């Protein structure tokens, strides 16, 4: 009986400890968890199970590694927020699977993504024909984001990020047949001289959108 009460007590304590730790780690939908999140969650679950089973082991021996995991996750999340390269390393980056109704088989192979997966996710988005898709983007979470054709049958343009967190996205500039010089000239027309002052800048349908960083002029 005493052992059962101990198990119940440890279960309740660890439940609230994990709850607090997850709260500090930030909010995220289950479908949007990164590999880092999954690794941390799985390790915490294993540690908790071992702690509940080994009633003779001190709870501190369980809580300490959980706190260490939390510190690792929060630290990496901070650097991921500040640095896009770190973010891409930890979370991966989106991959264009369909462009203007044409499937990119090489992109699918690189992501180990097969045609069955593609057709399932198209059907889930009420898409019957690949030709009706302007863009299909495989997100790091595994979700397929779809941009449909216009009602007129014309393909829609994908919003292309040109600046993220103050850093120019050279690869995306080449995708729209533009260069760094063109971008800097466009920014100057809008009154910006330094890309580092810009939080996000994108290009779509011939128009440029600019969102400056907090604390800069409006």
Swiss-Prot record:
Key words, A-Z: Cell membrane, Membrane, Transmembrane, Transmembrane helix
Subcellular localization, as worded in the UniProt entry: Cell membrane
Entry annotated with the keyword Transmembrane: yes
Membrane topology qualifier: Multi-pass membrane protein
Any GO CC annotation of this UniProt entry: plasma membrane
Primary location group: membrane
Residue spans crossing the bilayer: 4-24, 32-52, 59-79
Highest taxon in the source lineage: Bacteria
S-S bridge residues: none
Classification via Pfam families: DUF421
InterPro entries for the chain: DUF421, UPF0702_alpha/beta_dom_sf
PANTHER family per record: UPF0702 TRANSMEMBRANE PROTEIN YCAP (PTHR34582:SF6)
Family recorded in the similarity comment: Belongs to the UPF0702 family.
Protein name (Swiss-Prot/TrEMBL): UPF0702 transmembrane protein YrbG
């Amino acid at each position: 009986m005493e052992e059962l009460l101990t198990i119940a007590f440890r279960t309740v304590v660890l439940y609230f400890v994990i709850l607090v730790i997850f709260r500090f780690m930030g909010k995220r939908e289950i479908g949007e968890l990164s590999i880092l999140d999954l690794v941390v969650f799985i390790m915490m679950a294993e540690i908790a199970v071992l702690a509940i089973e080994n009633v003779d082991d001190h709870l501190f021996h369980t809580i300490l590694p959980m706190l260490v995991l939390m510190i690792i996750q929060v630290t990496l999340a901070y650097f991921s927020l500040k640095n896009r390269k770190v973010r891409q390393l930890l979370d991966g980056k989106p991959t264009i699977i369909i462009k203007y109704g044409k499937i990119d088989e090489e992109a699918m192979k690189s992501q180990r993504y097969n045609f069955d997966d593609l057709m399932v996710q198209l059907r889930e988005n009420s898409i019957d024909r690949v030709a009706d898709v302007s863009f299909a983007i495989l997100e790091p979470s595994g979700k397929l984001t779809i941009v449909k054709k216009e009602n007129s049958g014309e393909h829609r343009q994908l919003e292309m990020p040109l600046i993220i967190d103050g850093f120019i996205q050279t690869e995306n500039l080449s995708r729209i047949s533009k260069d760094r010089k063109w971008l800097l000239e466009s920014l100057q027309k809008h009154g910006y001289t330094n890309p580092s002052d810009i939080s996000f800048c994108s290009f779509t349908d011939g128009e440029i959108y600019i969102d400056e960083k907090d604390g800069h002029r409006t």
